[in-house]
Amino acid sequence: MGPAQKSGTDISIDDEEEILALEKLLGAAENENTKSAESEKAKPTAPILVPKLREDNSFANAFTFEKIVKPEKQKNAAIIKEPELDSSDDEEVKNFLERKYNEYGSDINKRLKQQQENAYESKVAREVDQELKKSIHVVTSTPQPLKNPHNPIKRQSAVSTTFQRPPPVAAAVASTSQSSAPVSAVFTDPVFGLRMINPLVSSSLLQERMTGRKPVPFSGVAYHIERGDLAKDWVIAGALVSKNPVKNTKKGDPYSTWKLSDLRGEVKTISLFLFKEAHKSLWKTAEGLCLAVLNPTIFERRAGSSDVACLSIDSSQKVMILGQSKDLGTCRATKKNGDKCTSVVNLTDCDYCIFHVKQEYGKMSRRSELQSATAGRGINELRNKVLGKNEVFYGGQTFTAVPARKSAKLITKERDRLSMLAGYDVSPFAHTANHTSKPKTAEPTKIPYAERGGPVSRLAGGVEASRKQRVQDLERLRLLKEENERFEKKKQAEGHVLGSDNKKESEAGTPAVSMPTTPVPDKFKNRGFSFDASLTPKLSGSENFSFEINVGSRQAQNAKLKAAALLKKKPLEKINPNSTRGSESGKRRAIDELNEKFSSSAKRQKIDEDDRELMRKSRIEKIMAATSSHTNLVEMREREAQEEYFNKLERKEAMEEKMLTTYKMPCKAVICQVCKYTAFSASDRCKEQKHPLKVVDAEKRFFQCKDCGNRTTTVFKLPKQSCKNCKGSRWQRTAMIREKKILTGRETLSVRGDEETFMGCLAGSANLNLLVPDEE
């Protein structure tokens, strides 16, 4: 080392010593200033005594992770993430002129180092994933909690395994048989009784932190605020039901408002205000989490608020997050305006709030018309049943519609139309006075079609033949006559024999046309039918025309020709004298052979039929015993239907249980300032006279008469009216619905009916129980 280098190092050492000495002097001066300022502050005025509740930071040990451990880890991570410099980088930084690589070479060197680091990190990540998979297969653990800044995933390591329990055998078998979604286990904390999934604090740790502190339930918050010892530590816990939007104070500081509830019985809520550091730390907390609050400050409850109490905190150390609530939910019913109901319910008890549970219970019942409030079909249906079809009830009066009358012209038109559609003709006896037939002795004269008279059917009479149509008909008749004459001449020219035969037959057939008129039976008189033979439809032309062909002679001639042709081909053979064919013995022998043949064939046929019957029966049995290859799907569908049926019954029973445990419910009441009464609705007189009305929040209570069991509702502590049934005043609290009881018959049997103590008295169910004892 040369002298120049030694002198440089000595100079640098002297400069560093001077800098350290200056820093010590400045630090001593600052310490003196701070001590003097504290002494000046301690001198003036006496201390002001402000009542303040004691804060214990040990309650929130679960959250010291974010304030102490987390910053230290972040610092260590920042130190670790600083780039490590090797010898070449150090030389480049210290000796810029003597660097090893140029810009291009240093860039390549950095990329190579990054690739090496990435390869190492991927290898480590792969090994960690393999270890995690092995641990997941070995140990069954609850899923990770919700991600939010106040219960990070890293805190899972601090939670003990006391909440974790092995699943039952049935659940394990079901999980292996069916690939369904994993169901999170439900846990109940031993102090507050809240049901949770994914708990963040173990039961032992919670009991340890609650030593010396009093858990206050929601039902006793009001009493504890008014008469309890607030100097001692007390804790209230519940589920975060809702969060109102962030607001600002008069000074401009933001604050949050939460609603907490324990979801038991009648769902009660409290308001929790978060100020200052509590708002800054917890404003992102998700809804549905179970919280425990230590020693909150008490606010005065706002008038008209439905909350049990109003509390506030200003430090996040007073809040402990227990886990995700299992029971929190909203009502599944729909309001009258079509919007979804937003009331908070306990899903374990029932899916509907107290305002809609009775309505849904009626819908779910099979005979919903009997479960309705009116227990009937309604006044409109009753009115429609009593009144007729032509009666209308309007404005307190009954109006009857006048039936429509048909005119005489319309009646005749309809009668003619019906008779025309039926095809009735005018009776041939309609021209006589008494509609009787006149005997026809003379032969009917042959007149042309156009000149015929007499009765004509209505269908034919309805159509008026024009002159042109008549001319065409006459021309057709003339042509037919000429054709007939020409045919007769041709037939006479063919042969006298055939012509003479035809002539005789035509002469014999001529009088057959003029047959006597068939007598009309008495039962067919005065009918629109025609029984006259002359009115039967015939072809126009000569009535004496007939045409016959002798077919038999031609067939005989053809048979003779065929026989002669056969004899020419092969002459007749001589008869065998020894042949018995055709004799009596031959016939008997043939008959015996046929009988044997048919009897054997019948036996064989019977055997075949029996075999076929057996085969058919066996086939039918196989068909009936055959099963589908998809029987497992059928069984699965049956199980699903059965499960759906029982789930419906369970929901119905849950609704019934909720109504049986509901003795009052919030409602709106009307106060008339003139008549001085409070009721569910205003009377008609107040509405007509427009009295000033005031609508207030009230509670609807249910009562039952001890004497007759009649039920009533009121907005007061007790009903102010007597029983409408028995005129008694002995009331007792009851549930929203009447409890169903199984009667054995002894409770309702009364041989002589309901007894009356005096005239006009109706003792609802007076029972004498006049039963005959059983004979031994």
From Swiss-Prot:
Modified residue annotations for Phosphoserine: 87-88
Gene that this polypeptide is encoded by: Mcm10
UniProt keyword terms in alphabetical order: DNA replication, Metal-binding, Nucleus, Phosphoprotein, Zinc, Zinc-finger
GO BP term (any one): negative regulation of compound eye retinal cell apoptotic process
Record remark: domains: The zinc finger-like domain binds a zinc ion and is involved in self-association.
Matching Gene3D superfamilies: Nucleic acid-binding proteins (2.40.50.140)
Any one GO molecular function term: single-stranded DNA binding
Pfam families to which the protein is assigned, alphabetical: Mcm10, MCM10_OB, zf-CCCH_Mcm10, zf-primase
InterPro entries: Mcm10, MCM10_OB, NA-bd_OB-fold, Rep_factor_Mcm10_C, Znf_Mcm10/DnaG, Znf_Mcm10_C
Compositionally biased spans, kind Basic and acidic residues: 32-43
Residue numbers spanned by region Zinc finger-like: 331-356
Disulfide-bonded cysteines: none
Entry-linked PANTHER family: PROTEIN MCM10 HOMOLOG
Family recorded in the similarity comment: Belongs to the MCM10 family.
Superkingdom of the source species: Eukaryota
Main location: nucleus
Disordered: annotated segments: 30-49, 430-468, 487-521
Function noted in UniProt: Proposed to be involved in DNA replication and to participate in the activation of the pre-replication complex (pre-RC). May be involved in chromosome condensation.
Species of the source: Drosophila melanogaster
Keyword Nucleus: yes
Subcellular localization(s) per the UniProt record: Nucleus
Cellular compartments per GO CC: nuclear replication fork; nucleus
Protein name stated in the entry: Protein MCM10 homolog
Subunit-level organization: Self-associates. Interacts with Mcm2, dup, Orc2, CDC45L and Su(var)205.
